Amino acid sequence: MLRGEKIALRARSEADVPVLHAELHEDVATRSRADSRPWRPIASGQGSPYAVAEPSDGAAVFSVERLSDGELAGEALLWNIDLHNRVAHIGISLRPSHRGCGLGTDVVAVLCRYAFAILGLHRLQIETLADNLAMQRAAMHSGFVVEGTLRHSAWVEAEFVDEVVLGLLATEWRMT
């Protein structure tokens, strides 16, 4: 288990799946903002994007637990991990009741520590919708810098929207 100030990142359990699925996948508006594929109904089970999966070199998937009460707060992951080039992408998704209280900032910080200090990665990247200011603030708190804008690169609820690309190198990272 990886601990921050407010959260812990732990392995996904079967008990997490229905909660994450109900609150993160079934919220069509939120899910369509977080996924590059169109939303479609999926039963909460093995087809769920939150199902427990075998460990892989290409992704590190965590459940986010709030330390104050042990409650499941959401999911966090390093995805598209490339061990040769030592790069990966960060993704987080918090349950609605756990947003806006600083957990995302702590999640990003713990993922950075895992990526740089444990995996020995060299670069992390985040792509987020341009209006997702909370994610941008959380990333910049850990040292990420805005590297550019991908204009009209995401199709979200009947319109094209911009994405912001943020990056962080191991040499720029400050361990907190």
Feature locations, PLM:
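A short helix-loop-beta-strand connector motif used in the catalytic cores of GNAT acetyltransferases and
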Residues: A51-S63
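A generic alpha-helix structural signal
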Residues: H21, Y50-A51
